[in-house]
Swiss-Prot record:
Entry GO MF terms: S-methyl-5-thioribose-1-phosphate isomerase activity
Alphabetical list of InterPro entries matching this protein: IF-2B-related (IPR000649), IF-M1Pi (IPR005251), IF_2B-like_C (IPR042529), Initiation_fac_2B_a/b/d (IPR011559), M1Pi_N (IPR027363), NagB/RpiA_transferase-like (IPR037171)
Name recorded for this polypeptide: Methylthioribose-1-phosphate isomerase
Binding residues annotated for substrate, in chain numbering: R44, G45, A46, R86, Q194, N245, K246
UniProt keyword terms in alphabetical order: Amino-acid biosynthesis, Isomerase, Methionine biosynthesis
A Pfam family hit: IF-2B
Length: 345
């Protein structure tokens, strides 16, 4: 299963809200349809969101039928619409900046067709970069996995969260392919259940041993000595190493620290935002209260009960053992070493 696939004039998006019960695709032919798919979490995961937004930007140009002189204003509207879909995942904004830069490079173009072709090529380049980067993350991350390891992960940072292969799950895949005996504990990840619905499905499809657990079981597993390593993905990493990821990640980091268990973040360098000094400056998306009051349309709480439903939390850098990127593994002091790595790249 691929999270998304370019079809030449539309974007084929796997509707992940229906997994694992049903495999259904959306054929997005306009940038608005891509934006809706991102908002509804039909496509999710920071790298996949970035790639989807890039294709959405290209579709904005493909769908434009006005004069060449008016394209720039139209594309500003397209970019704004896509940028407002998910505020926390920095890959979204990184991809849109790349697309905007490619559009500016076409200032001497005489035909709309030439510009459209260039934008599609840039979107495909972003997608291909993600495929390559995820393999490198897996290769570097394999070094931290012992010959036999029980690994805890949270949410879904696999192929379904990227264009291909995955970040946190990419490390696990690489370890398995290297002949290591890995067993994964996947937290269910309330309220959207990405761990239960997506991570468990991915790992089972790849014949990687996996056990699904309730989110509130993680501490007990660690206490029993059943966890050797925690690996999670990321939606935005601040300049000091503070990391925004799916709600519940911070709790796992605190538990891992208390039990002396290594806690790693796996993410591409496009997830690192050096313009954000610390986690306090990362915008945190709040989702619809219905996601907590209901489970798949079934009411599980009083309909009027107040709800606080942030989609992400921030794990302080001091709780992170290392950040696995395509450039290698970065360790503390992050404010120094992240900058060094980004300058080199």
């Amino acid at each position: 299963m691929k999270a998304l696939e370019w079809m030449g004039d539309s974007l084929k998006i796997l509707d992940q809200t229906r997994l694992p019960v049903e495999i259904k695709y959306r054929m997005a032919a306009t940038y608005e349809e891509v934006a809706e798919a991102i908002e509804k979490m039909e496509v999710r995961g920071a790298p996949a969101i970035g790639a989807a937004a890039a294709y959405g930007y290209a579709l904005g140009a493909i769908g434009y039928s006005g004069e060449l002189a008016g394209l720039s204003a139209h594309m500003e509207k397209v970019q704004h619409r896509l940028a407002e879909t998910r505020p926390t995942a920095v890959n979204l904004f990184w991809a849109l900046r790349r697309m905007e830069d490619r559009l500016r490079d076409q200032h001497e173009a005489k035909e709309l067709a030439e510009i459209r072709q260039a934008l599609v090529a840039e979107a495909e380049s972003i997608a291909e970069d993600d495929r390559r980067v995820n393999r490198l993350i897996g290769e570097h991350g394999n070094a931290i996995v012992t010959a036999e390891a029980n690994i805890l992960t949270h949410c879904n940072a696999g192929a379904l969260a990227t264009v291909e292969y995955g970040t946190a799950l990419g490390v696990i895949r690489a370890a398995q392919q290297a002949g290591k005996k890995v067993h994964v504990y996947a937290g269910e990840t309330r309220p959207f259940l990405q761990g239960a619905r997506l991570t468990a499905l991915e790992l089972m499809n790849d014949h990687i041993p996996v056990t699904l657990i309730a989110d509130n079981m993680a501490g007990f597993l660690m206490q029993q000595g059943n966890i050797d390593l925690v690996i999670v993905g990321a939606d935005r990493i601040a300049a000091n190493g503070d990391t925004a990821n799916k709600i519940g990640t911070y709790s796992l980091a605190v538990l891992a620290h208390a039990h002396g268990i290594p806690f790693y973040v796996a993410a591409p360098t496009s997830t690192i935002d050096l313009k954000v000094p610390s986690g306090q400056d990362i915008p945190i998306e709040e989702r619809n209260p219905k996601e907590l009051r209901e489970v798949f349309g079934v009411q599980v709480a009083p309909p009027e009960v107040p709800v606080y439903n942030p989609a992400f939390d921030v794990t302080p850098a001091k709780l992170i053992t290392g950040i696995i990127t395509e450039k290698g593994i970065v360790t503390s002091p992050y404010s120094v070493n992240l900058l060094k790595m980004m300058v080199r790249s």
